[in-house]
């Protein structure tokens, strides 16, 4: 980790370049503090408190730093005991740390849509998932986001694993909403997003297909979507 930080901090800009530090977390699963709440004991797993220290150091050296989360943030480590509170630990932490994007993961849907919407309603950044739709046919969350670093425009496209349907529909956790196929939505989003200098996929998906289902892994998805070649 120290070598990675040193690498980031020692890079230098010149008149033809701009150094942008993109920092991302994923699968935090309720470990905001280095504490296992189910066992009520300290854990070496780490947590967002440790991440926060690294982020602060990098931001001090490079103001062109962006922090995002790629999904599975709110579930785990006994965080379900806070579901009916006015304030949920995850949103309090990510607001404090200055996360600009929260991508939805499959576990964000474990508690149902009403709970999820209530939790992210207190988030100050951009909640994203390009393949989540309401019954009226409109996207429930942002599918893409553009961040400006001076004259440079960085685009972010968001997708979640379509396996959410298999995990959550039978439980009734998607009531009133639909999760669509990632390949179809990626084609749409590539058409919709304005021209940018760089395009980054924020996908809560593995590299390879899940259960041998096509386009549930990023490698298969990008190979099959022709516009992704651009």
Segments the model singles out, each with a brief description of its role:
Residues 1-230:
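Acidic, metal/ion-coordinating pockets
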């Amino acid at each position: 980790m120290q070598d990675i930080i040193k690498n980031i901090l020692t890079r230098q800009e010149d008149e033809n370049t701009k150094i942008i530090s993109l920092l991302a977390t994923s699968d935090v699963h309720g470990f905001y503090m280095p504490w296992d709440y189910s066992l009520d004991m300290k854990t070496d797993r780490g947590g967002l408190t440790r991440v926060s220290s690294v982020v602060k150091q990098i931001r001090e050296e490079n103001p062109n730093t962006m922090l995002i989360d790629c999904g599975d943030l709110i579930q785990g480590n006994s965080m379900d005991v806070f579901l009916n509170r006015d304030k949920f630990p995850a949103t309090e932490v990510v607001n404090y740390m200055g996360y600009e994007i929260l991508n939805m993961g499959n576990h964000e849907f474990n508690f149902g849509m009403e709970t999820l919407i209530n939790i992210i309603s207190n988030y100050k950044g951009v909640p994203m998932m390009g393949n989540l739709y309401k019954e009226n046919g409109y996207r429930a969350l942002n599918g893409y986001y553009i961040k400006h670093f001076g004259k440079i425009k960085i685009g972010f496209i968001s997708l979640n694993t379509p396996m959410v349907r298999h995990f959550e529909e039978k439980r009734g956790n998607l009531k009133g909403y639909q999760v669509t196929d990632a390949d179809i939505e990626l084609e749409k989003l590539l058409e919709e997003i304005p021209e940018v200098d760089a395009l980054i996929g924020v996908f809560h998906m593995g590299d390879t297909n899940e259960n041998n289902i096509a386009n549930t892994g990023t490698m298969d998805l990008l190979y099959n979507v022709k516009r992704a070649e651009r």
